[in-house]
Regions:
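Acidic/glycine-enriched connector segments
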Residues: 187-192, 196-367
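SIR2/sirtuin NAD+-dependent deacylase catalytic core
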Residues: 1-178, 185-192, 209, 232, ...
């Protein structure tokens, strides 16, 4: 969800570039109409370049905004109350923005939701008099103090390039609440089929219960259990299916499945920050023998290149055991559990319930 006072289409184009369906609200009459299956909503408070006659430009239009666009202000105030905002490149000179901030403060007093504003720190320009610089500096300090009255915390930066770093850190933290579960099995050795299926259901349920989102490709021998465990917990917690789990079964009967499946895996993983790997075996179509899942190796490589935190449960064997070995030899803790956690995940004497506790402990640690 984005709010903007700009008329251009930069936000919409950026969303389109990552295959997101965008619902644009640029007029009060748009607010009551929801676009089917949209991934993001963009509120354009001052209108859109496609409707130049309806944009907010003049002083008279600004002064009448509270009457002509009251529905926009009400929606903005609702979001300020229920969501955390990050303000970027927005001028707080906008009288309508001040109106909403004051109204939210009047409603909630000291209990306002905290928001954030990124602002470049004033610096002395070449040739600028010291007294002029000190005046601008003091002016900024007073502005920052004033924003605190509206529960807006200012983040000072020295250069605009720092914004990208901040947004990347926010995205990474957000994605670490979304877990990709990679698993497939036609054969079970270290643990029985019944134990594995029950474990997968419990894992999915625990993830939902602890407010993680799940993405899964409905792997052979795993898809039903991922869906069942998650669906039961979603129902118990009165959550919505769409916001908590995304099941993406691989399309079949394609002329070039390898290329299509690669793109499919990329799409699944790009919206996650953690990848859990379980078992990973299949029957070879030529020899009819059980082999490791090459698709799981591809998912591991894609997850690693995306920067996901990788959790291979080596004790479940097969391809996951290979991935566990690869990860132990990499010695890179930036994307991996600790050495003790990895050794625990490879312990075949432990029950799957114990491995589940280890996984959830890791997730809690990296999200704290």
């Amino acid at each position: 969800m984005s709010w903007t006072t700009n008329f251009d289409k930069l936000i919409e184009k950026s969303l389109l570039n990552v295959n997101k369906i965008c619902d644009v609200k640029s007029l009060p009459s748009n607010l009551a109409i929801a676009k089917d299956k949209s991934d993001a909503i963009v509120y354009k408070m001052h209108g859109d370049v496609d409707n130049p006659d309806l944009t907010i430009l003049t002083r008279d239009q600004f002064e009448k905004y509270q009457q002509t666009h009251k529905a926009f202000l009400d929606s903005f105030c609702y979001d300020l109350t229920n969501k955390t905002f990050l303000f970027l490149g927005l001028s707080f000179d906008d009288p309508n923005l001040h109106y909403v901030l004051k109204y939210a403060r009047m409603l909630h007093g000291e209990n306002q939701r905290r928001h954030y504003y990124i602002l470049r720190k004033v610096s002395q320009e070449p040739g600028e008099k010291t007294e002029d610089f000190e005046y601008r500096k003091r002016e900024q300090e007073l502005f920052i103090e004033d924003m605190k009255n509206y529960a807006v915390e200012t983040i000072l930066i020295d250069d605009y390039s720092e914004i990208t770093e901040i947004l990347s850190a926010i995205q990474k933290r957000y994605l670490r609440r979304t877990v990709f579960i990679s698993g497939a099995a036609v054969e079970y050795t270290n643990y029985s089929e019944k134990e594995v299926k029950e474990f997968v259901k419990k894992l999915s349920a625990r993830l939902i219960r602890d407010n993680f989102r799940i993405v899964n490709g409905y792997g052979l021998g795993f898809g039903d259990e991922v869906l069942t465990g998650a669906a039961q917990q979603i129902q118990n917690d009165h959550k919505t299916f769409e916001e908590n789990i995304k099941i993406m079964p691989f399309p079949q009967g394609l002329p070039n499945p390898k290329e299509a499946w690669h793109q499919y895996r990329q799409e699944m993983i790009q919206n996650t920050g953690i990848s859990i790997f379980l078992m990973g075996n299949k029957k070879d179509k030529t020899s009819c023998t059980i082999i490791g899942s090459n698709g799981m190796q591809e998912e591991y490589d894609l997850s690693k290149s995306h920067g996901n935190f990788l959790i291979p449960v080596g004790a479940t064997g097969y391809k996951t055991k290979d991935l566990w070995t690869q990860q132990m030899s990499a010695h890179d803790n930036s994307f991996s559990p600790t050495k003790n956690e990895m050794e625990s995940l490879d312990d075949e004497t432990k029950s799957l319930d114990e491995h589940l506790d280890t996984i959830m402990s890791i997730l809690e640690r990296i999200n704290s």
